[in-house]
């Protein structure tokens, strides 16, 4: 087919950037595609162009993407557009799937027995439990095993050495030893996991030139979708395979890289021209999904990131709907607002960072008979260490002579005693029938500090059965020593907050325990109704999807972002922080017509405040105030002359504590002198001489020399 006919038949609706991507066939090409830009349509059209216009045999083209579902969808869409016969000759694979093919070819060619792939989840779980109990005295929970699996995947996909493994921050006990034992046991059993397929494939391609040559002869054109989610080892496999032909078409967007915990390696997109000299870098910046206000807000937000390539989202759909800011006074109000919307007939997609954020809303929906859809595959809340601790503590309060519970809990109650003293209390309680904590007080060699603390702990626990569930949780945290234990171990107390929201509906601790069991059973049996008005999803699971109305839930400081920008002290901290920004951005860009954000003074959100700061009405208000202030003040003194408008920042993040502190006198180029009254995330709240308080973006005013402190702290 000639190019003109192909263009008329398949490219008539494509914009110039999309057309340029379709016809970029030879050599290394990086296509940076913003959310909603039609990248899958372009990728499929390009495959058709390569075959029908360039005469490239479809068997010579290898298209790789992130998931099996994505490969199936791509094959289906290609077949619908260019015919099933042609689709049957194309290769669509995950990189894991390609690695399996490399291993099979190597085994046949050299008559080598390859390790057996672990395909049963139960086999892997038993193996992980076995090695965990060799290293730790604790029995691993489901969430602990998930964390260990994630860590192993990260290690293999990042190709970390022992030093790199030791540097991983984790709550797991002795991760290097766990990993060594895991690998040794795999080798002993002749097993490999899914990530090992890539590890072995890379080793083979490096060490066996005939194998590499075979695949380079089979494939001369390589297309990679979702390359921002591709790991370091996967990029190395791709580089080896495409190294001879150099015909590599990589599609991605570093602004949407949100799988760092799985070893996603967006640096490969940033370094593409360095790895592939002479490469083309193309952009697709037109967003066909979201309304202009949503696109504008998302564009302003993501532009603040440092580790990105300059690009500007452009809304095609016009003014479809607003970014809606809902003022609330508590976390609970999010839940009631969403539920009220559903009761009024609205359809909403509620997105959040962690699956547990959905539980209070699910609890309410189950009580009221409202349908919902919920992807629950990663829900480990009920087996989390903290949740199990709390349920154990509530059970122990009702059964103060239960030795099994006591031995699991005593050191979590602010009672740092040796185990022999705990065992002494167990033996004495078994003889006397008295509560364990009472017998512990009678232990002859217990320290004075513990002896003084025990009556308060015992009184706190004894009071729990007579309290509401919410009151009991507060008592556990504040009076029974458990909150201090969490702080000492630097454990996230977010699970306690979710338990508190669930407990707010229950009259007693016993009823909360019962409700947790009910919810766990309900979720295990839950079937998603197709017509449910409410969709509940993590932002990660919503990647690639879109909804008319999106609500971002629980995007508060400490959750999303996990830590504030002012707390970033190392490049690694900054990378984690910027991935949190990208996660928020991905959540925003799922919305077509309506994006709802919650603004809660009691639970600050630096990200949401930044969005509010850049909304059209806020910008217009600032411009009006600046113009009025300038009129009243007259010409600005030279030392404070504002700099010209700049592109998104290239300077390092500003530590606001170096610029100002609460109570500090400051001077602003437009508003004059004032006093800092609050620092929240990146924002300074300043009361100026005209009596007005203004919230200013710290890095912006510092970068443009708009603000100075008049004193040193």
Tell where the protein language model's regions lie, with residue ranges.
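P-loop NTPase Walker
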Residues: 1-112, 213, 296-299
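Conserved helicase NTPase motor core
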Residues: 6-7, 12-23, 27-38, 62-63, ...
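Short glycine-/polar-rich loops that comprise or flank the Walker A/P-loop
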Residues: 27, 56-60, 87-88, 244-247, ...
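Helicase P-loop NTPase motor core
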Residues: 35-43, 47, 277-280, 285-372, ...
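ATP-hydrolysis module of ASCE/P-loop NTPase motor domains
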Residues: 87-89, 108-196, 419-420
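Conserved beta-strand -> loop -> alpha-helix junction used to position metal-binding or nucleic-acid-contacting
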Residues: 87-102, 370-393
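Conserved helicase C-terminal RecA-like lobe
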Residues: 168, 393-617
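C-terminal accessory regions
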Residues: 555-692, 696, 705, 709-713
